[in-house]
Amino acid sequence: MLLLTILPASLMAAMLGGYFTWMQLSELQSQLLQRGEMIAQDLAPLAANALGRKDKVLLSRIATQTLEQTDVRAVSFLDTDRTVLAHAGPTMISPSPIGSGSQLLSSTGTDATRYLLPVFGSQRHLTSPIIPAEADTLLGWVELEISHNGTLLRGYRSLFASLLLILTGLAFTATLAVRMSRTINGPMSQIKQAVSQLKDGNLETRLPPLGSRELDELASGINRMAATLQNAQEELQLSIDQATEDVRQNLETIEIQNIELDLARKEALEASRIKSEFLANMSHEIRTPLNGILGFTHLLQKSELTPRQFDYLGTIEKSADNLLSIINEILDFSKIEAGKLVLDNIPFNLRDLLQDTLTILAPAAHAKQLELVSLVYRDTPLALSGDPLRLRQILTNLVSNAIKFTREGTIVARAMLEDETEEHAQLRISVQDTGIGLSSQDVRALFQAFSQADNSLSRQPGGTGLGLVISKRLIEQMGGEIGVDSTPGEGSEFWISLKLPKAREDKEESLNIPLGGLRAAVLEHHDLARQALEHQLEDCGLQTIVFNNLENLLNGVTAAHETPAAIDLAVLGVTALEISPERLRQHIWDLENLNCKVMVLCPTTEHALFQLAVHDVYTQLQAKPACTRKLQKALSELIAPRAVRADIGPPLSSRAPRVLCVDDNPANLLLVQTLLEDMGAEVVAVEGGYAAVNAVQQEAFDLVLMDVQMPGMDGRQATEAIRAWEAERNQSSLPIVALTAHAMANEKRSLLQSGMDDYLTKPISERQLAQVVLKWTGLALRNPAPERQNEALEVHVGPLVLDHEEGLRLAAGKADLAADMLAMLLASLDADREAIRVARANQDVHALIERIHRLHGATRYCGVPQLRSACQRAETLLKQNAPHTEEALNDLDKAIIRLEAEARVMA
């Protein structure tokens, strides 16, 4: 209380006292300066005559008299050049004023103020008449110094008086405050104690009257508050008791609900397990008859058929393949939903992946007269790591949808770099079409399961509606995102943004081609296709010159002929609507007469049509959209053809493998047996696991093909029994390969854990059977196609070097696609052979296996059974560190040479 009273009063007194003291000091200082100016002004006329006469005695007397005035410290009279004529008082301590002229100058220091005033002839009028000629003549200077000491002393006295008054007032205020605090502190202490007791829960506490009206009102308010709190507490306690009773009654209900929730959770888990098991069983049940349908369809296609029957079989095969793709989509979706889809992380080439995808889908686009274009920006890293199979699946889905929903125009696939670090690359891959477009409502429902933009009964494009959902889930699992920008009636652009780690650049993949510095004329009427083609040719080292029609191109080549700027190549992108094969053949003849090599790019659907226009189909005719690697190889061959080497090698194996086939389904068993026997294998077929175990114990086999799901003893149990029997006799393990229709990852892992060495997923093709036999036995099977004879009636022993029928079958009956796949393989053979040679010279087994495995993968999609078998055998022996590895590698080298030679002959 005392502090609250004294502190504001003290602050106010200090502020007012300080303010008035400062005002008084300022006033005294101002008066002092004015007195100094007045004294200086008065001295000027008094000393004017003396200064004019240079009368030092008179000037000294005036100066001495001036010192008698208050606060005057020193006086000086100066000549015109400021030489001292007379001085009185101590030495001046203030700095001399700076300046000149007719005005009074002053300079203020800490203890004194110094004045300097010029004296002119006009100031003599006080003692003598004014002489006009001397009115403006400078007679001298009056210098005066005024001391601040007197002023400061008066200021200190005023300050002391102010402080004395302030202290007196504060003492009086403190006395009053003490008396008032004594009358307030007692009641306040009582209030404080009462509030403290209320805080501690003593709500019965009440305050008595405190002696004043205000305090009594405060006490009354506190008492009412205490009574209210007491009543509220009693009501709260009653509520708590009631709530406790309610909780006690509800505990049993909550416990029952928890039990029900636990049961529901177990039921949900069981339902999920049953769903997964159902999908696996359905996969088996559907794939098993599909295996028979596809297998026997292939067998029927080898027999003598009428054209109509062959078409019927093609329809059956296509329908079965479509059904299989639908099943695969549903199973992929189920695996993603269950979180069981595992992504690979292997190196791949982005440009090859994108262009290969477009190559596979080109026939469908060209059948609708659509233009397919791939643009890979040059700053985009090509060597990346990830899951190329799943990325290809996503791109295939996006491009397929674009083809499906585009009636005319262009489909452009772009790959560009968004951001880059030393280790990673942020990519944006987009597929843009000129199709029907999507509304905002369609876009919102686009990435939902079993949903399509048009779900009406009259919709034309088909599908399960799972493709985009699977793509979205895959991209999200890769850590990226997928989206679409679309305008109804104008088209759509589906894009994916994905961050992938960079891979080591494979220097061996770069082709050493003699194209650097050559000039190429380019003709392509489609703007984007022309831009993509220009980039590809420039990446090959060519200098490009673009022409807008074939006549201008021919004129340009003619004009440049026999000049330093001659054009070496002409790359023509044409369609049957733009030029006929006969007319094109004439232009090619004219260009070749000008020493200009010609390459023709045409749609896959018109490949057979334009074969008549070129001399060398292999090097001169390529399908749109052109693949960079394939284009490089073809251009290199066109500029510098290689010598043909046709070494004929020995057969790859000396005896037929002996295979045990086990399956409870007679149709599947007959199919596998027939396929193997047609390829030259000795087959023993049994139904059931018990029969398989007995057969292994009684006969010797090179390989066992074991069905997994069989009654009685299934494939796993039979494998475990065989392994136990082998362990008892210390025998080497017989290779056992599972034939399964299950596609779940955990199913495949459990098969390998049960003792099986490998697995094949139904439906099974001849190629898969031949590969697995070669992989686990080292014995190559004969190609099942009918034997052919060349012009010399040479009979092929073992697998054929080049089997067009098999290539056509692997390409789903599409001749153009089969030719493109074969051309892609042939384009990479030189680089693969050189890489294998370098790896053998360096004894780098890892690089050797990697390169052969890559070549082996490429042969799986082409009708080159002999090279495929050689790759399989070499890879198997290398992995097993077998003694016949060098022989297998030599056979592989000869197989490559034979394939190149036969390709040249067939072309």
UniProtKB/Swiss-Prot annotation:
The chain crosses the membrane at residues 9-25, 84-101, 159-178. InterPro entries: CheY-like_superfamily (IPR011006), HAMP_dom (IPR003660), HATPase_C_sf (IPR036890), His_kinase_dom (IPR005467), HisK_dim/P_dom (IPR003661), HisK_dim/P_sf (IPR036097), Histidine_kinase_BarA_N (IPR019247), HPT_dom_sf (IPR036641). Its EC number is 2.7.13.3. Residues 182-234 form the HAMP domain. Residues 281-502 form the Histidine kinase domain. The modification 4-aspartylphosphate is found at residue 707. Forms part of a two-component regulatory system GacA/GacS(LemA). May be involved in lesion formation, swarming and in the production of extracellular protease, syringomycin and N-acyl-L-homoserine lactone (acyl-HSL). Required for pathogenicity on bean. This is Sensor protein GacS. The gene is gacS.
